[in-house]
Amino acid sequence: MMSLLPLLLIGIVLPATQAKDYGKCELNQILRERGVDKVISLPELICTMFHSSGFSTETEVDNNNHKEYGIFQISSNGWCAEKQEDVERSVCGILCSKLLDDDITDDIVCAKKILQLPERLDHWKAHNTFCRENLDQWNC
């Protein structure tokens, strides 16, 4: 029985640091509270997030010579940094690995920086493919 105690403790601690899957209305509320609706149409953004990450914070995708991270699928190609020494040169000033946890506060800050650029949602391929029209299903 004593040998199971360390495994039990690991099982209790690990879920607190693991990723989270959000629902569309939960995300809608969080994004609205953080003022993202002042920057971009939430149905368009939520559709793009769904088709990019499935609303999962742990999504990590290899995309040719860079990776995309987290619920917003933020690219290591200039937006976030894969190495600590590159953080200051990245637009969002964050390690990409920090975009994979269940706290999406820093993800939202980074996404807002990207969304305020002229290309806005066009930085995400899923937006052009799936989220330009018929967005009623993404309302809450």
Curated annotation (Swiss-Prot):
Main location: secreted
Domain C-type lysozyme: 20-140
Secretion signal, residue range per the UniProt entry: 1-19
Record: residues binding Ca(2+): 98, 101, 103, 106-107
Swiss-Prot/TrEMBL keywords: Calcium, Disulfide bond, Lactose biosynthesis, Metal-binding, Milk protein, Secreted, Signal
Superkingdom of the source species: Eukaryota
Subcellular locations according to the entry: Secreted
GO cellular component terms, semicolon-separated: extracellular region
Oligomer and partners: Lactose synthase (LS) is a heterodimer of a catalytic component, beta1,4-galactosyltransferase (beta4Gal-T1) and a regulatory component, alpha-lactalbumin (LA).
Role, per record: Regulatory subunit of lactose synthase, changes the substrate specificity of galactosyltransferase in the mammary gland making glucose a good acceptor substrate for this enzyme. This enables LS to synthesize lactose, the major carbohydrate component of milk. In other tissues, galactosyltransferase transfers galactose onto the N-acetylglucosamine of the oligosaccharide chains in glycoproteins.
Name by which UniProt lists this protein: Alpha-lactalbumin
Origin species: Trichosurus vulpecula
Gene of this entry: LALBA
